[in-house]
């Protein structure tokens, strides 16, 4: 039911509209010309480029609508003859280590599948529409090398619409910045193993021992210092957690993952994820220097598919087709960690700053079905013979679907 004040406002507005229509003929041609010119320049200065804004709106208006009640991450993979929008030769920025076809992978069936949610459709990635949505924005992928893998997929997809400028690379090629000048869009990566401050223990020869100390009371400043300049942050980190790690909160030692030491609290990997992600998401939510409308997308753990061993004991991932839904292990460590990550995100959204937006990119279950999507031995390995990559994803490949999800998420948050 409308309030009396709103009804009065609508009545007054209608009277004003009728008066304008009845008396418009009395206005001089000069006034009409001035009015049109004023309207044009108002639009120009307020919207900077009204023509581009209208073009962006037209592009987005033709995009399929997504049922907000549909769970995009529950479904299965179906054959798709179209394949990816790009090829291993059409995208110049694919690293050799992810360019599986270039490295000699003989099968190509893994390229011709798409994700189909149960009960709805996930629209195919549209680079023109995506760039329209993120015009003038800065997007940062924060995490380990799988986060970089994700960014590289998006970079290839967007390059089909506009060639980006490579404007920054650090000495170790871990942090990169790309710029799309026609859309004033910045795409970057910020490398971090654990998201929080970490230190590797060293022996008497100053050689790394593989033992890490994490302080969940301190965020890794390498990425967090750049957060105030970010509009959309895709946050993830996972694969460095599967090793001996001592977890601290300041001077207090909370326990250890994979240590089995006497008088030391044993922490499971999923509990370690809970402690880290709870601290990280809280810091993001409470970041006073960050933009009020900052969007944070938490990407859940991406599963590895080693068989007949691990990465350092000859494990492989040589399958050439997806798994069916019945092959998913709902009790796997990855699914437990996924649950822990999502619980921390839900906790923040329930009590968080309503201006800041949070969303989940839930790839764990989706990618458990794609043991065929990894480089395996086709990653240009010259120095580590016998080691197979069953963690990262071929480009092009199943990881491209993550950007179908990302586009849907950003559109829903608009």
From Swiss-Prot:
Gene deletion effect: No visible phenotype. Loss of O-acetylated xyloglucan oligosaccharides in seeds, but no effect on xyloglucan O-acetylation in roots and rosette leaves.
Broadest EC class assigned to this enzyme: transferase
Membrane topology: Single-pass type II membrane protein
Localization: Membrane
Active-site residue list: 145 (nucleophile), 389 (proton donor), 392 (proton acceptor)
Keyword Disulfide bond: yes
GO cellular component terms, A-Z: Golgi apparatus; membrane
Molecular function per GO: O-acetyltransferase activity
Principal cellular location given in the protein's record: membrane
Enzyme Commission number(s) of this protein: 2.3.1.-
Lumenal side: 48-414
UniProt KW keywords: Disulfide bond, Glycoprotein, Membrane, Signal-anchor, Transferase, Transmembrane, Transmembrane helix
Motif DXXH motif, residue range(s) on this chain: 389-392
Transmembrane parts of this sequence: 27-47
Superkingdom classification of source: Eukaryota
Sugar-bearing residue positions: 88, 205, 263, 308
Alphabetical list of InterPro entries matching this protein: TBL, TBL_C, TBL_N
Cytoplasmic topology ranges: 1-26
SS bond list: 70-120, 91-156, 100-394, 317-390
Role this protein plays: Xyloglucan acetyltransferase that catalyzes the acetylation of fucosylated Gal residues on xyloglucan side chains. Predominantly catalyze 6-O-monoacetylation of Gal residues in the Fuc-Gal-Xyl trisaccharide side chains of xyloglucan oligomers. Involved in xyloglucan specific O-acetylation in seeds.
Other remarks in the entry: Contains 2 motifs that are conserved in esterases, but it is unlikely that this protein belongs to the catalytically active pectin esterases.
Family: Belongs to the PC-esterase family. TBL subfamily.
PANTHER family: PROTEIN TRICHOME BIREFRINGENCE-LIKE 9-RELATED (PTHR32285), XYLOGLUCAN O-ACETYLTRANSFERASE 2 (PTHR32285:SF28)
Name of the protein described by the UniProt record: xyloglucan O-acetyltransferase 2
Organism: Arabidopsis thaliana
């Amino acid at each position: 039911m409308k309030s009396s004040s709103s009804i009065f406002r609508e009545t007054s507005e209608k009277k004003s509209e009728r008066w304008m229509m009845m008396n418009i003929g009395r206005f001089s041609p000069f006034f009409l010309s001035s009015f049109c010119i004023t309207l044009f320049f108002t639009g120009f200065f307020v919207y900077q480029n009204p023509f581009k804004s209208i073009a962006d709106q037209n592009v987005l208006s033709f995009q399929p609508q997504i049922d907000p009640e549909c769970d995009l991450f529950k479904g299965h993979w179906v054959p798709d003859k179209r394949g990816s929008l790009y090829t291993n030769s059409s995208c110049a920025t694919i690293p050799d280590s992810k360019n599986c076809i270039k490295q000699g992978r003989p099968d190509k069936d893994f390229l011709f599948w798409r994700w189909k949610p149960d009960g709805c459709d996930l629209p195919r990635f549209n680079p023109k529409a995506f760039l329209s949505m993120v015009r003038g924005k800065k997007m940062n992928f924060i995490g380990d090398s799988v986060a970089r893998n994700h960014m590289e997929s998006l970079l290839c997809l967007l390059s089909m619409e506009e060639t980006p400028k490579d404007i920054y690379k650090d000495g170790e090629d871990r942090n990169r910045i790309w710029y799309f000048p026609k859309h004033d869009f910045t795409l970057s990566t910020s490398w971090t193993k654990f998201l929080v401050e970490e230190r590797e223990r060293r022996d008497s020869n100053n050689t790394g021992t593989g033992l890490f100390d994490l302080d969940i009371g301190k965020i890794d400043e390498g990425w967090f210092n750049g957060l105030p300049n970010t509009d959309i942050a895709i946050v993830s980190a996972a694969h460095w957690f599967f090793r001996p790690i001592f977890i601290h909160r300041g001077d207090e030692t909370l326990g250890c993952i994979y240590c089995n030491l006497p008088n030391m609290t044993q922490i499971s990997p999923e509990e370690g994820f809970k402690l880290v992600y709870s601290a990280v998401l809280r810091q993001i939510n409470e970041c006073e220097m960050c933009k009020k409308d900052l969007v944070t997308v938490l990407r859940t753990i991406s599963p590895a598919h080693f068989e007949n061993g691990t990465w350092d004991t000859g494990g492989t991932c040589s399958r050439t087709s997806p798994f069916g839904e019945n092959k998913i292990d709902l009790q796997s460590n990855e699914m437990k960690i996924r649950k822990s990550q999502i619980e921390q995100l839900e906790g923040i959204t329930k009590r968080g700053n309503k201006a800041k937006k949070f969303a989940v990119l839930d790839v764990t279950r989706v990618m458990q079905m794609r043991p065929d999507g990894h480089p395996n031995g086709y990653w240009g390995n010259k120095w580590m013979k016998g080691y197979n990559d069953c963690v990262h994803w071929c480009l092009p490949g199943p990881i491209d679907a993550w950007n179908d999800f990302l586009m849907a998420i950003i559109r829903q948050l608009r």
